[in-house]
Amino acid sequence: ALARERSFTKAAKQLHITQQTLSNYVAQLEKEIGSTLFVRNIPLKLTYAGEIYLRYALAIQNQMENMQHELDDVSQKERGLLKIGIAFSRGRILMPKVIAAFQKEHPFVQVKLVETSNEEQRIKLLNHEIDLVITNFTEDIPGVTMQDFYDEENVLLISEVLLDKIYGADKESVLEKVAILQNLYPLKDCPFVLMNAENIAGRIGREFLAEAGFEADIKVESDNIETLLSLAIEGCGACFCPEILLRKTLSQETLAKLRVIRLGDKAKYRICFGYAKQNYQWKIIDEFVKVALDTIQE
């Protein structure tokens, strides 16, 4: 907690102990191992010795968890804490039904959702801070097993009000040109609201805009796709977003006020499960994956 928070105050609060207790513990630990673990600046920083200690501590913690999982599996005790990394919007769409179905079969397993960016999920997985991620992998990652979940597609969403305001009677011909050219240049006068580049929708959106060859008028950037979707509905700009988000969250009445532009194969990608390769694979991870696959096909 201290290495992550880089603050005695924040780490002590997270651990539900006093700052003095934590400070005394670290000082005693440093005395025992004969090395200084932290540079006590603001924020705190691990020394080289601290980085070594943390690496071994995380490895030991991971081995202890694996041992407990294997013992539970041998004794057929389905219990424990399953930590899952997933993007916030994807979690909102997928997890309620998946977790409900999973906990019917495994009522004594607690699920903790770590809702964060795709890149942060990968880092936490490699650091053994989470057991399973649900994300798009752009490349193979050493030490990580990947398994296909489902295919996702980004679309471009523009409100009819915004199209009428910018293009008037020409809006249908503009959209027809976009479809024929498979290029967004005809929309060069349209404002955009974009996810940040670290997110899938933000990355794909920027690739399409760069290919179109014009400098887009980006009105808003955000990490929250649902905020951007609401802005697009209000006519603030065109928005790149996952098609599944529209289908699962918007009413037919709202969809009728929007124009959805499909962008072809370049806007499609695969969502996968990812979990660290271990000497022993916790059975509960496989069980969760199985339930999720069954649920998505319903």
Walk through the language-model features, giving the residues of each.
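Hydrophobic hinge/microswitch elements
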Residues: 118, 126, 136, 198-259
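Short beta-strand-centered segments that line the small-molecule binding cleft or hinge
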Residues: 98-101, 119-169
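Beta-alpha-beta core module
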Residues: 141-148, 152, 185, 226-278
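Short helix-boundary/capping micro-motifs
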Residues: 1-16, 43
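A short LG(V/I)-centered, amphipathic sequence patch enriched
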Residues: 30-48
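Secondary-structure junction motif
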Residues: 164-167, 171-212, 281-290
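Alpha-helical linker/hinge and terminal dimerization helices associated
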Residues: 32-33, 53-75, 137, 292
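N-terminal winged-helix
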Residues: 19-20, 69, 75-106, 110-123
